[in-house]
Amino acid sequence: MQITILGSGVIGVTTAYYLAKLGHEVTVIDREEGPAPETSFANAGQVSPGYASPWAAPSIPLKAAKWLFQKHAPLILRLTTDPVQYRWLLQMLANCTDSRYKINKTRMVRVAEYSRDCLIELRKDTGIEYDQRSQGTLQLFREQYQLDGIGKDIEVLRQDGVPFEVLDRDGCVNVEPALAHAKDKFVGGLRLPNDETGDCFKFTNALAKIAEGLGVKFRFGVNIKSLLMSGGKISGVETSEGIVTAERYVVALGSYTPALIKALGLNAPIYPVKGYSITAPIVDESRAPVSTVLDESYKIAITRLGDRIRVGGMAEVSGFTDDLPAARRATLDLSVTDLFPGGDLKAATFWSGLRPMTPDSTPIIGGTRYDNLFINAGHGTLGWTMACGSGRLLADLISGNKADIRADDLGIARYN
């Protein structure tokens, strides 16, 4: 089939790759001049299925109220005049129950674990390189109450068969030796040995080249204006370079997905939640991480990417903003300096990206009420973690193949 994919981030490119492998004729359209220049450009770098947890958790309402008054809060709420923001926040609050948390986390871990397996298989098949490491991730707890409160997450990990280790201070230092100098800064950790790390931008660009070798065509610098309808189905995409037609269409536009499909009467409650990162060259190996360490207090991930340290995190609900506040940079600097002062922060680059978040933190993967329109968006903070699995899953659904994992609860129908 002829298939047009809108969006060339990591989700769009992985979808294109898997569709091409199944023999489809694929075209990818994006307004940017190359793959992954926005949200996929400088994310935290970890592929962490076991840490796939909803932001909408039972404890979040109370924590959010406290964070409003903290200088280095992991969640920042900047209210706008946009009613969409308020509706999204209310929907998120509705998911902050024990029952919804378990349902959402189970769905997220299902997609994320499958995606990690798909990534490993893709790497074996292609030999793709992207500063990859397979040395697990460590969630670091600075306070005892944080360590004491991981029971619900461990329950889900056991239920899903995800290996884990609860570590004391010495155990944390054993897997991340550079933490030896900071043993007084934490009480313990939760380690997931099967998690990985890697540069999402490098991966996406390398995979785009591999996809081109499979026949995928990329049309960059093309603005997407609207989806056209005829006879109850999508008949084309109106772009700055004319109308593009295909047999099937995939919307993989991250936070911009709702605006495109709204005219079709489709509701995708995806809202941009801004994240920040810095990337610094390593100048002291003995004080740099081996893999990824998640600083639970600040919700920040510190990741080793080759000869660089990537420090990323926080969640700012402020709409489509691209500013780089000094206060956010200060929080990133504080966390990494405290734990892994092996990078040259003076030479670091500062970045922000808009994570496409759904109220339940679960991505939208699947078809719509229009037979030839599909969506792959809303992965939030886990686009890199879920990319390969999401792309392969949707490719199977479009092709009429039996999916490897359950997909009926991932579609847009849960909102419409």
From Swiss-Prot:
Pathway: Amino-acid degradation; D-alanine degradation; NH(3) and pyruvate from D-alanine: step 1/1. It is an enzyme of class 1 (oxidoreductase). GO terms for cellular component: cytoplasm; plasma membrane. GO terms for molecular function: D-amino-acid dehydrogenase activity. Its EC number is 1.4.99.-. Pfam families: DAO (PF01266). Gene3D superfamilies: D-Amino Acid Oxidase, subunit A, domain 2, FAD/NAD(P)-binding domain. Belongs to the DadA oxidoreductase family. Oxidative deamination of D-amino acids. This is D-amino acid dehydrogenase. The lineage of its organism: Bacteria, Pseudomonadati, Pseudomonadota, Alphaproteobacteria, Hyphomicrobiales.
